[in-house]
């Protein structure tokens, strides 16, 4: 292409330019080139030196991408530093929907449907070929052959998170630059005196390879209307550019099946502080360019309330465009600062120093939204995942790839925000292909290039009889041998010895498969059993990756089975539903007929899918529901999507069709009070009574779980077979040493210390065991829990009932505000005292839990602890539902409100999705509530009710204590429907331990001699005052400014400890904090320090220090702080 000289000036120009090129490995190279050389020629000139082909180079200067047809001198880069990043070459045309079977990733999600259209001003953001998401599909045989899964999670050099942050910032800077260029070229702004356009234009627009998600508008003419945060389009488009790199037309030689990432070195690639400074300087320049538009922005918004645009349509459009563009620029600018704000440089390190981050990127990663689903599906695209598969299969037709192109597929799926990359369906690797009838194990390698997790895995359980175009044939009978149970048992022992792989044998396959998308459905009955195990296997593998990586994960999902539409051989996004019914299969070798259950409705299937993926199949309605080829749904971290798949998979090997798998039981009772992260289930049935897994010994189950988990944990650096604690695991990955330490940030008080104890003693295997109803981990932790409660809960006192009640009150005194805040915005049943009701209820429940922990020493400790948690959960839900007049929406609002308050700092989209899921699950639980009204009416307290015989003492203890109900309910309330049913089958929960309220009340009244001298209604009030004054929660000293604004009466009643003015107290406190001991006895040291002359000298020194500080503090004003002035500045 010839250079464009239209912008050349008549000014005398130098003959040569010295250009410095900095690459992502922090190396800077200097090139001297001719001044008339254009950018494209310059790229070719430096290609050999930087080892990056010219078509993959992207040169960035001051946040702008250098255009190939411009001359270098137009950008004024002489003597300046240009940043070079590598990207995939732009496509010259769109793929045709199916490429030449090399396993490439160019097929669009809709199997060749055209990409989403873009606005005229839109720009496609090229992305550096790392640190973003690569999605793909892989297929599993259904003939019972094994699947060898290698999960490699080594980080690529670009995955230095500080480097990723800088690259992200540079990308957003480029986006802002594009918006500024558009604003600077608007004629109406120039007429108003706006800045003149610079020699800048949007980056080149390589043709899109995948359709844009429905919810995303990538910098269109109205960018402010985009629903998605800025990183979404960038990351989505990164996939667009990585995918074409794998296109067979651009990749020389036969490529292996699946994407082939560019080779990287293993050396760390941390950026230097100087690079950070350059980015900040560029941001400063952008802010200065934005200032003129901001001024106009202020003017337009200032007059927007009253401006009349009736006769000025053009002016209105111009102002609206300005508002949109400036608003979008501010959003990108703010997100850029957010991405950079966590970068730090530790000056204590030895040179050369580099940047590090103080908060993981997942804190800011925003999921994309699939609006086609029944509820929005969040998809996190913040990392790179490449999935490659190799194996043998019948050779495809020359032009057919995994998703066969055809109108059937396009009609059966909907546009999605993900790019489906077929990695296991491509042509066989080089070499002679075996006969079609031969089936070998497939190897699926999932390469995860970041500690930050991924998320898109499409899985299709492929029929072994696939015909040459990817068309599955219909088997005529069960293909699985009767010995699948033995096969599984033989495979499992290999787990600990081969920690880098997981070997899975599939249970009985389905009787029939859907036919080709273009043809009619295959005649025959779809077997729910086989499809259930298909989905279970998909969930096990795909859920496993995300379950342990603490991010949303895509797992298998299918379309409803009432009239299953044709499905492609490769899974893809579902068109309008998120329904899947995963059920346990029949006995191996037995009749493969589904149980004769009526077909559930569409809504039932939706609930089945939601509950099935989050907490296991939901009730009998899910059984036998035929589903089509699995596609997509979402499993949240902290909920056992993987566990459900494991459960179904293991249950398929039992000798009889088992009931639904056990729901996740709650963690130990105290943890329920601690407000764990959103999404972690805290409620469920304690015993797996009568369930399929009961026949599995804990040792066998542990070996299975350990083998599966060791695959990922080994990839993350854990030793094979090690039982690394959750705290150690997170500390090692985060690089921080103060996570889960008592007293550290986020671990305050008793509950924080308890959570720390649990995380330090539980491994991930223990958590899986607990979630499946095995209480052995709790039983093992009994000594530590008992010691912890004795020291932190009772303060070393004897565990008598009165001491336990007093300790509960002390612990909960500061939590009452949470109860009040939680119910402040909902309508409570008239006459009900919701605060007192919850406090007394929680008091009683926690007393029984604490008494059990402190007193129980037998082998029933763990089982009883889970039972107490379940009892408290259901009664709490039933009680508050009654107090809210039976309004489920009000109860859901209370729970979701607490979740939002607890989730400050968590991605808002994720929180919104979580609250939606909680509401759906809560509805199922309440429909099967095992606790009747009679069981909870005794807890209800009404306004003005005379104190019940004893309510007060437990109330107080309770009062403060039960403030934790909300945290507990939010985390625990969303229990699975199966949990409620199991609890119902066990009968009403047992009465709480301890005597009745009346007995306790009577005892309390008898122990208070003054109670008879006052009116009965005053007794509880006086008792509460006595207890609250006796046990005031300590708080740190308050500042002078805070105290000066506090009412005098409140200030006088403050019980917080102020600064210690006595030398003996100050020295003893400092010595205790430092762990120092006096040379003499503490008593003699205290006597010496209490001498009047020493005390007076200390007071004078303290006064002098404060006076000096006040004189040097520019913010101190005697008029504003008169008390400080009188106390310290004036002469005595």
Curated annotation (Swiss-Prot):
Residues 242-636 are annotated as: 4 X 29 AA approximate repeats. A motif (Nuclear localization site) lies at residues 1012-1054. Expressed by immature dendritic cells (at protein level). Residues 1058-1115 are annotated as: BAG-similar domain, required and sufficient for interaction with UBL4A. Component of the BAG6/BAT3 complex, also named BAT3 complex, at least composed of BAG6, UBL4A and GET4/TRC35. Interacts with GET4; the interaction is direct and localizes BAG6 in the cytosol. Interacts with UBL4A; the interaction is direct and required for UBL4A protein stability. Interacts with AIFM1. Interacts with HSPA2. Interacts with CTCFL. Interacts with p300/EP300. Interacts (via ubiquitin-like domain) with RNF126; required for BAG6-dependent ubiquitination of proteins mislocalized to the cytosol. The ubiquitin-like domain mediates interaction with the E3 ubiquitin-protein ligase RNF126 which is responsible for the BAG6-dependent ubiquitination of client proteins. SGTA also binds this domain and competes with RNF126 to antagonize client protein ubiquitination and degradation. The ubiquitin-like domain also mediates the interaction with USP13. This is Large proline-rich protein BAG6. It comes from Homo sapiens.
């Amino acid at each position: 292409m010839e250079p464009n000289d239209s912008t050349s000036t008549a000014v005398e120009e130098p003959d040569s330019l010295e250009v410095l090129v900095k690459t992502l490995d922090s190396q800077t190279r200097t090139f001297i080139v001719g001044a008339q050389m254009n950018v494209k020629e310059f790229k070719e000139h430096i290609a050999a030196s930087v080892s990056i082909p010219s078509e993959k180079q992207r040169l960035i200067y001051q946040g702008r991408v250098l255009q190939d047809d411009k001359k270098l001198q137009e950008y004024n880069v002489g003597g300046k530093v240009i940043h070079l990043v590598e990207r995939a070459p732009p496509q010259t045309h769109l793929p045709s929907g199916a490429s030449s079977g090399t396993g490439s990733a160019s097929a669009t999600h809709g199997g060749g449907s055209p990409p989403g259209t873009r606005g005229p001003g839109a720009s496609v953001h090229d992305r550096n070929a790392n640190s973003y998401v690569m999605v793909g599909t892989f297929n599993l045989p259904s003939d019972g052959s094994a699947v060898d899964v290698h999960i490699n999670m080594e980080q690529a050099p670009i995955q230095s998170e500080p480097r990723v942050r800088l690259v992200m910032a540079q990308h957003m800077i480029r986006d802002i630059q594009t918006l500024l260029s558009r604003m600077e070229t608007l004629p109406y702004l120039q007429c108003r005196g706006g800045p003149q356009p610079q020699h800048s234009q949007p980056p080149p627009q390589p043709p899109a390879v995948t359709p844009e998600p429905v919810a995303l508008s990538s910098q269109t003419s109205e960018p402010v209307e985009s629903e998605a945060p800025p990183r979404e389009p960038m990351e989505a488009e990164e996939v667009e550019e990585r995918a074409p790199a794998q296109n067979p037309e651009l990749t020389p030689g036969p490529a292996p099946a699946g994407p082939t990432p560019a080779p990287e070195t293993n050396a760390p690639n941390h950026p230097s502080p100087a690079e950070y400074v350059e980015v900040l300087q560029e941001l400063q320049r952008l802010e200065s360019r934005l200032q003129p538009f901001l001024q106009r922005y202020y003017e337009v918004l200032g007059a927007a309330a009253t401006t009349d645009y009736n006769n000025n349509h053009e002016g209105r459009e111009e102002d609206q465009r300005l508002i949109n563009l400036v608003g979008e620029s501010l959003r990108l600018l703010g997100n850029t600062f957010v991405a950079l704000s966590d970068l730090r440089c530790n000056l204590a390190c030895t040179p050369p120093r580099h940047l590090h981050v103080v908060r993981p990127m997942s804190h800011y990663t925003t999921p994309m939204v699939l609006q086609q689903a029944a509820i929005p599906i969040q998809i996190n695209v913040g990392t790179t995942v490449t999935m490659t598969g190799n194996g043998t299969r019948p050779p495809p037709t020359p032009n057919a790839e995994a998703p066969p192109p055809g109108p059937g597929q396009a009609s059966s799926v909907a546009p999605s925000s993900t790019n489906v990359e077929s990695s296991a369906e491509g042509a066989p690797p080089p070499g002679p292909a075996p006969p079609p009838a031969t089936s070998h194990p497939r190897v699926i390698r999932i390469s995860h290039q970041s500690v930050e997790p991924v998320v898109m895995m499409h899985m299709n359980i492929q029929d072994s009889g696939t015909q040459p175009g990817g068309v599955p044939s219909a088997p005529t009978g069960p293909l699985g041998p009767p010995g699948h149970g033995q096969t599984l048992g033989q495979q499992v022992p290999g787990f600990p010895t081969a920690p880098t792989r997981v070997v899975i044998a599939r249970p009985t396959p389905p009787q029939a498969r859907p036919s080709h998308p273009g043809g009619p459905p295959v005649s025959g009955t779809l077997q729910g059993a086989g499809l259930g195990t298909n989905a279970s296997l998909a969930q096990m593998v795909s859920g496993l990756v995300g379950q342990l990586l603490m991010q949303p994960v895509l797992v298998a999902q299918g379309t409803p089975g009432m009239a299953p539409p044709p499905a492609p051989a490769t899974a893809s996004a579902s068109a309008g539903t998120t329904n899947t019914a995963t059920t346990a299969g029949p006995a191996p070798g037995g009749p493969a007929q589904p149980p004769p259950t009526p077909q559930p409705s569409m809504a039932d299937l939706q609930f089945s899918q939601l509950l099935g993926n989050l907490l296991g199949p939901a009730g009998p309605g899910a059984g036998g529901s035929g589903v089509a080829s699995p596609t997509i749904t979402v499993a949240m971290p902290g909920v056992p999507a993987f566990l459900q798949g494991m459960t179904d998979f293991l249950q398929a090997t039992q000798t009889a069709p088992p009931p639904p798998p056990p729901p996740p039981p709650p963690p130990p009772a105290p943890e329920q009070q601690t407000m764990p992260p959103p999404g972690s289930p805290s409620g469920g049935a304690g015993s797996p009574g009568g369930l399929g897994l009961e026949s599995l010994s804990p040792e066998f189950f542990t070996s299975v779980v350990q083998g599966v988990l060791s695959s990922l944990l080994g990839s993350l650096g854990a030793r094979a077979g090690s039982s690394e604690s959750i705290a150690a695991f997170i500390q090692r990955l985060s690089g921080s040493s103060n996570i889960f330490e008592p007293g550290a940030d986020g671990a305050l008080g008793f509950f924080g210390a308890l959570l720390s104890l649990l995380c330090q003693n539980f491994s991930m295997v223990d958590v899986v065991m607990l979630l499946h109803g095995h209480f052995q981990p709790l039983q093992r932790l009994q000594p530590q829990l008992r010691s912890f409660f004795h020291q932190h809960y009772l303060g070393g006192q004897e565990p008598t009932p009165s001491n336990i009640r007093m300790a509960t009150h002390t612990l909960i005194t500061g939590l009452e505000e949470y109860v009040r805040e939680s119910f402040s915005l909902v309508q409570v049943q008239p006459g009900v005292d919701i605060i007192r009701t919850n406090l007394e209820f929680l008091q009683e429940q926690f007393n029984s839990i604490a008494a059990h922990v402190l007193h129980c020493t037998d082998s029933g400790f763990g089982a009883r602890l889970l039972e107490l948690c379940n009892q408290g959960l259901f009664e709490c839900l039933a009680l508050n539902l009654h107090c809210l007049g039976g309004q489920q929406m009000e109860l859901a609002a209370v729970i979701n409100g607490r979740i939002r308050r607890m989730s400050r700092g968590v991605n808002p989209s994720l929180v919104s999705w979580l609250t939606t899921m909680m509401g759906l699950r809560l509805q199922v639980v309440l429909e099967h509530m095992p606790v009747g009204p009679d069981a909870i009416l005794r807890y209800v307290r009404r306004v003005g009710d005379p104190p019940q015989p004893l309510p007060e003492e437990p109330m107080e203890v309770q009062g403060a204590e039960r403030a934790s109900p909300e945290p507990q309910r939010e985390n625990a309330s969303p229990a699975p429907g199966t949990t409620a049913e199991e609890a119902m089958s066990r009968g009403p929960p047992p009465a709480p331990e301890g005597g009745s309220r009346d007995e306790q009340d009577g005892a309390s009244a008898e122990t208070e001699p003054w109670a008879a001298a006052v009116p009965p209604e005053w007794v509880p009030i006086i008792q509460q005052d006595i207890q609250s004054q006796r046990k005031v929660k300590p708080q740190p000293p308050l500042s002078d400014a805070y105290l000066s604004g506090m009412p005098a009466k409140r200030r006088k009643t403050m019980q917080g400890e102020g600064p210690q003015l006595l030398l003996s107290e100050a020295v003893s406190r400092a010595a205790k904090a430092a762990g120092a001991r006096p040379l003499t006895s503490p008593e003699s040291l205290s006597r010496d320090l209490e001498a009047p002359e020493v005390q007076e000298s200390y007071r004078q020194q303290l006064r002098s220090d404060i006076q000096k500080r006040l004189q040097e503090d520019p913010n101190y004003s005697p008029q504003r702080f008169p008390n400080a002035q009188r106390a310290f500045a004036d002469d005595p």
